Amino acid sequence: MGDMIEFTSKQRKALEKLAHDLQPVVIVGGAGVTEGVVDMIDNSLNAHELIKVKFNEYKDEKKELITEVCQQLDASLVRIIGNVAILFRPAPEEEDRKISY
């Protein structure tokens, strides 16, 4: 696994702007961050690179949970706004990347 990306404030702002109109693609509910949820996040990152994950439950633990998921999936946390986390992971192949950072 590689390292999570450390964004400059300019890069972070650009990614936040791109994520603004996105709807959450994964919702964390009563079961918490299960293997199925992690798989959904992984598949969504493969398809979109930039996604939102909404926490309907476990709101107090969201920072720790999403940090753990990012480490598992080699993704980067852009920002948490309210109960929504914005995650980014570039496509492994440069020619497949939709977002430059």
Describe each model-derived feature in a short phrase.
Residues 2-101:
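Positively charged, polar, low-complexity stretches
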